[in-house]
């Protein structure tokens, strides 16, 4: 396992995930009967700061259809949590207009690179072009100065 599992922290994430799903109207319990489901949800809502009891609740009451989705969500959250500790792994987001994203995604696909790798490559290409233009401008000025001195 690449990232250490922190039971207390992850129980809090699981609790938040389940409460969010419940508020969005998803069935988070394994019970078909509404009163049993509501009773289990009410119990869950009281367990926010009790990680061991949250895990027990999950084992006893959670809808089996949510198991894999919750695992994926927690795995992604764990990765983001640990990556945020180091500057070089910390992720940043930018807002792009759809057309810009579409062009960038197409270019990345054609180059066989990720969006981040494509952006870095475009920046490097622009920097190289700028450096080349500056060098040519400098050479042109030097050449004009040499030709001007010889007259």
Curated annotation (Swiss-Prot):
One of its GO terms (cellular component) is cytoplasm. InterPro entries: Arc_rbn_hlx_hlx, MatP, MatP_C, MatP_N, MatP_N_sf. It comes from the Bacteria. It is found in: Cytoplasm. Keywords: Cell cycle, Cell division, Cytoplasm, DNA-binding. One of its GO terms (biological process) is cell division. GO terms for molecular function: sequence-specific DNA binding. Homodimer. Required for spatial organization of the terminus region of the chromosome (Ter macrodomain) during the cell cycle. Prevents early segregation of duplicated Ter macrodomains during cell division. Binds specifically to matS, which is a 13 bp signature motif repeated within the Ter macrodomain. Belongs to the MatP family. This is Macrodomain Ter protein. The lineage of its organism: Bacteria, Pseudomonadati, Pseudomonadota, Gammaproteobacteria, Enterobacterales. The gene is matP.
